[in-house]
Amino acid sequence: MAGNTGERPFVDIITSVRYWVIHALTIPALFLAGWLFVSTGLAYDIFGTPRPNEYFTAERQELPIVSDRFNALEQLEKLTR
């Protein structure tokens, strides 16, 4: 038999005006913040990932794949030059 936890039912929450007043501002603000985070390039700087135009340089057009695990450091040095 299911008991009562004393919490407010979910249907009551999402049909309340207070919920939508709060979330009508916060949900679009989160999307806007995420878009700005990526479009300004800050995400690339913080996480250290290369930007789309930095994956391949003019000198190196092949995929930078490490194929030999025992000589991985040598391969990485050669790939990052």
UniProtKB/Swiss-Prot annotation:
Cofactor: binding comment: With its partner (PsbF) binds heme. PSII binds additional chlorophylls, carotenoids and specific lipids.
InterPro entries found in the cross-reference section: PSII_cyt_b559_asu, PSII_cyt_b559_asu_sf, PSII_cyt_b559_CS, PSII_cyt_b559_N, PSII_cytb559_asu_lum
Binding positions (heme): H23
Location in or out of the cell: Cellular thylakoid membrane
Alphabetized SUPFAM superfamilies for the sequence: Cytochrome b559 subunits (SSF161045)
Similarity comment: family membership: Belongs to the PsbE/PsbF family.
HAMAP family (alphabetical): PSII_PsbE
Function statement: This b-type cytochrome is tightly associated with the reaction center of photosystem II (PSII). PSII is a light-driven water:plastoquinone oxidoreductase that uses light energy to abstract electrons from H(2)O, generating O(2) and a proton gradient subsequently used for ATP formation. It consists of a core antenna complex that captures photons, and an electron transfer chain that converts photonic excitation into a charge separation.
NCBIfam families on file: cyt_b559_alpha (TIGR01332)
The protein, known as: Cytochrome b559 subunit alpha
Species assigned in the record: Synechococcus sp. (strain JA-3-3Ab) (Cyanobacteria bacterium Yellowstone A-Prime)
